[in-house]
């Protein structure tokens, strides 16, 4: 009996790197079984030399180190069976490298690994160097999506103005997931799906092309823009044996983490997917043939992103999710340190969730937008309806969790989901899976059945895309 196909899925997230091995299982409702998975903290944050405190950058070497640790932890005999590799990662961000010099393949024990060489830091989606006045000075995009700070093309424009010498050092650019695919396959030029291209800005999803005329007129270095390919198609094949994965293994075009996450758990077209990790996304599938209005509206809280097969997802993407809870925990730890007390962040997190679980309701209202929002960058967080009876840790934590969900509701009213034909909400994401209070607030807010999926994340989605692609190729 021929062995069933196995695919490897990788997700290069903001705070962690995940890897998952999936095997086809036609007899199961899901169609697959998870053989193994692994996650490692990236711990890649680093200072920005040119952007100062507004910058949000990550050390690519540390991200790849976390990836290597993930692969090293997976069963070697299963890695030998891998027939396809799917890669997803954090959208909007950008790193630069020298073509042909982006990495070096080295012996790492029994197999080869690659290590970054002539690469820049990754400027992430959280980067804040492009303020409102700078964004207003940029040319108008020929796209249904507007441009925000942290978007790849906006970052290039900023570097062009503030650090032009920096750009002269590199001749290739992409998201972190595009970089990994390019290194695995030894691509002479990076390839990018429309999912990631749209997240950079200045990309027209209908024509599947960059706004080259607009960008050229503005002096933009268009040679840095990757070539475009269909999500779900093949980028190339591995140029080396990699952690027991055979040389010549198919590698898919890199996907956006949003699309891969949605793909992993949208069982029906009538499902909406709520993902609460570092940030928050609420996504629903648009009808086939839907085309967004071609005029970008920076004030619109709902964006329409490319999905698969030229369809779109309607997405409310909030910058404020698990990172808000992390900020609150860090604040409490810092306050206690100022008072001469030491306590672990993990202890504070678990205690505050316990306290909120016992506090079933509160009048305290927290608008949790400590990072602003893309459509309202200057509207920061606030606390209202403060009374002396609502100041316990339980009250504040309950109000914070409720505020995260209500902020999303203000961006995409749940009545709109009904009009799109949504019948169920599937909840996923690390912040949701480990926070019972946040789950309660989600169930309270949505007028639909809510189910919380197990093992729902972008690494599984990336593997699943490759697995189903592999199976469809076998069909007559």
Swiss-Prot record:
It is found in: Cytoplasm. It is an enzyme of class 2 (transferase). One of its GO terms (cellular component) is cytoplasm. SUPFAM superfamilies: Actin-like ATPase domain. It catalyses: sedoheptulose + ATP = D-sedoheptulose 7-phosphate + ADP + H(+). Pfam families: FGGY_N. Induction: Up-regulated by IL-4 and IL-13. Down-regulated by LPS. CDD domains: ASKHA_NBD_FGGY_SHK. Belongs to the FGGY kinase family. Acts as a modulator of macrophage activation through control of glucose metabolism. This is Sedoheptulokinase. The gene is Shpk.
